[in-house]
UniProtKB/Swiss-Prot annotation:
GO biological process annotation, one example: translation
Pfam families membership: Ribosomal_S6
Molecular function terms from GO: small ribosomal subunit rRNA binding; structural constituent of ribosome
Keywords carried by this UniProt record: Ribonucleoprotein, Ribosomal protein, RNA-binding, rRNA-binding
One Gene Ontology term, aspect cellular component: cytoplasm
Superkingdom in the source lineage: Bacteria
Entries under PANTHER family matching the protein: MITOCHONDRIAL 28S RIBOSOMAL PROTEIN S6, SMALL RIBOSOMAL SUBUNIT PROTEIN BS6M
Gene3D superfamilies (alphabetical): 3.30.70.60
Cited HAMAP family: Ribosomal_bS6 (MF_00360)
Name of protein: Small ribosomal subunit protein bS6
Keyword Chloroplast: no
């Protein structure tokens, strides 16, 4: 298993229930495919450096996890097709 770090920015237009649902969906995707979440941190709503999709704020979430490369590819695919995700980044960390 490899170590990864992901940060994603959710739309500020999502209500709390929708936001928590998306966060749980992403966490479950990792765990159900044999991955392990080692760190999870919700940074909350912050101002963006520049507007993204005409929005000036976003809800930031940071997560570290261990998994196979297939899981990170699937997570990226799900980020891409999820409407509430403004931006995301997944990097492999070397421990």
């Amino acid at each position: 298993m490899r170590s990864y770090e992901t940060m994603y920015v959710l739309s500020p237009d999502l209500n709390e229930e929708e936001r928590k649902g998306l966060i749980e969906r992403f966490k479950n995707l990792i765990v159900e495919r044999g991955g392990e979440i080692t760190n999870f941190d919700e940074w909350g709503k912050r101002k963006l450096a520049y507007p993204i999709q005409k929005k000036s704020e976003g809800y930031y979430v940071l997560m570290n996890f261990n998994s196979s490369p297939d899981v990170s590819r699937e997570l990226e695919r799900v980020y891409r097709i999820t409407d509430g995700v403004l931006r995301y980044l997944i990097i492999r960390t070397d421990d």
